[in-house]
Amino acid sequence: MMLHWRPTILACLPLWLTGCATVTPAPQIAPQVALRVCADPNNLPFSNQAGEGFENRLAEMLADGMGGKVEYTWWAQRRGFIRNTLAAGRCDVVMGVPAGYGQALTTRPYYRSSYVFLSRADRRYRLHALDDPRLATLRIGVHVLGNDNPPPAMLLAQRGITGNVSGYSIYGDYRNPNPPAVLVDAVARGDVDVAIAWGPLAGYFATRASPSLEMTPVDQPADGTWPMQFSIAMAVRRDDHDLRQRLDAMLQQKRPQIDALLRQYGVPLVADTSLTDASLPGTATPSR
């Protein structure tokens, strides 16, 4: 979910802004600086190889603001993604990680979203709480990550709701476009009555589904054991403070455009007054 700095430019003003001074009067053209991004080539609404995801478009927006362009390394988002990409030096930026993610240095958040209930609009469930008694009998679909369960599945299990819950792999069938969309498709077909999914994913595919689907945010349980909301940031290597600072400045500068982009993709946004989330537990990350 970077800019590649060279020691030879340290004595110059930033190349992406002005170019270096020279001893000749001829005008100099600053070379473009690459924002090297590692991303999943088949993971809409976040990213794909055609550049159709909102993280693709955000990366382009930031690179353009820095006077450069995006260079991608494509890598399926699986266990070990950060280790095999960012930490291995294949790129300088990964988009879409929880703010405070422990395996990297993270930027300021650029949005905050929530898990949501997703159901067919004609059912009129209008669910909000995991303690709603109807969840004991409704057929529920959730994303799963291998042997790991995301927060909704854990909270349902804590309430003894397991027998009527079906798991859909967040990885899906990678041979097909948009593998995570299988959960939304299950709701539209009527295979499950309601799904609990990460809001950005659900919002994007719900607007394209037929019949119409209804989406409502999941209320945060009173015990607070598993968060339902997350602030999302970008990851850089732990020692790359300079790049983080530049990305932070660009995120602040592009705030209105970023909000408009997220709304265009149907991302349900949650107000975030602090934009400074503490480090989040690795097991409590949104599934995507």
Regions from the PLM with identified roles:
Residues 16-19:
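C-terminal motif of bacterial Sec signal peptides marking the signal peptidase cleavage site
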Residues 21, 53-66, 121-124, 131-147, ...:
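Extended ligand-binding regions for polar small-molecule ligands
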Residues 22-103, 174-177, 264-268:
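Extracytoplasmic small-molecule ligand-binding "clamshell" domains
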Residues 22-23, 69, 147-172, 248-288:
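Ligand-binding clefts/hinges and TM-proximal coupling segments of bilobed small-molecule sensing domains
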Residues 34-48, 130-159:
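Short loop->beta-strand "edge-of-pocket" segments that line small-molecule binding or catalytic clefts
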Residues 40-43, 112-116, 122-124, 167-170, ...:
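Periplasmic-binding protein-like
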Residues 60, 64, 69-135, 144-148, ...:
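Acidic, polar ligand-binding/catalytic clefts
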Residues 68-69, 87-96, 137-139, 182-183, ...:
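Alpha-to-beta junction loops
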